């Protein structure tokens, strides 16, 4: 699972050799520090892994951390919030992610026929 928060980007997986914990990885240490602090664990450096930083956390702790991250959403624009917490260089990378994901929009996403529109908003 890829997760973007106002403090960074992490990738969480459950390895077959350690099914009792989630291995949560990141490209930069700062992205993992809030989770490591909440879980009471140390960030492990693994320079030869696909992600250079990781923590091992119990599933319930990761779920609680995710819920806490969601409960802190008080902004109307994610990228602007990240510019405040991580700076503009990091935000530039988020724009690249946003642009890449724009390419995955399905063909009906910009449908203008009112009969085909959802009743919900945003």
What is each of the regions a protein language model found here?
Residues 1-122:
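Structured alpha/beta or helical-core interaction and ligand-binding surfaces enriched in interleaved
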